[in-house]
């Protein structure tokens, strides 16, 4: 990797590597709560939470009285049910019970103990980024922020492009954003299906394809805040 890669990209990759090893030293047990607290009071609450459940990885996305769960081989939508503590979601014999940084998943007759993966995007969320995607070989990071546009850093930081944010086009099973600035043309396709980072294995709720000036980049992404534009 070139030595000139920007600190943003390096920080992103280091955070994801940390996520992959989240089952090492156990964090202190938090008080029970409906959802994990944000890293700082000034930051909005995350829209998606990654959990490591032994050999399983999943992403949970709470929405009012239900949760969407994405895993490598399936996607689930579970309604919320009464619980003595935390937030419990259940449909039939399948349930997901979240208590702060820990959760219990019951699936296919098995019970899994889950632990929250540390949030690598707290700083970006605090800056107003609504969606972030990244990929490897070559390393790239894409930030979407309606007020400032789409900012893509790629080729390990050697290249970058910033184009205006345009209204996403939401279609069956995918969202597409196309924009340009007279020099760079960028198209982003977001598919709401489980994705694992190629370097760290960290789980994400979306698979992302970026095309910049005819060149295609593959990776994963996540909506960082609730209330983002439809399709993100």
Model-derived segments and spans:
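Bacterial N-terminal signal peptides that target proteins for export
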Residues: 1-9
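Hydrophobic-composition signal
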Residues: 11-14
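C-terminal motif of bacterial Sec signal peptides marking the signal peptidase cleavage site
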Residues: 16-18
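Cysteine-centric segments in proteins
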Residues: 21-232
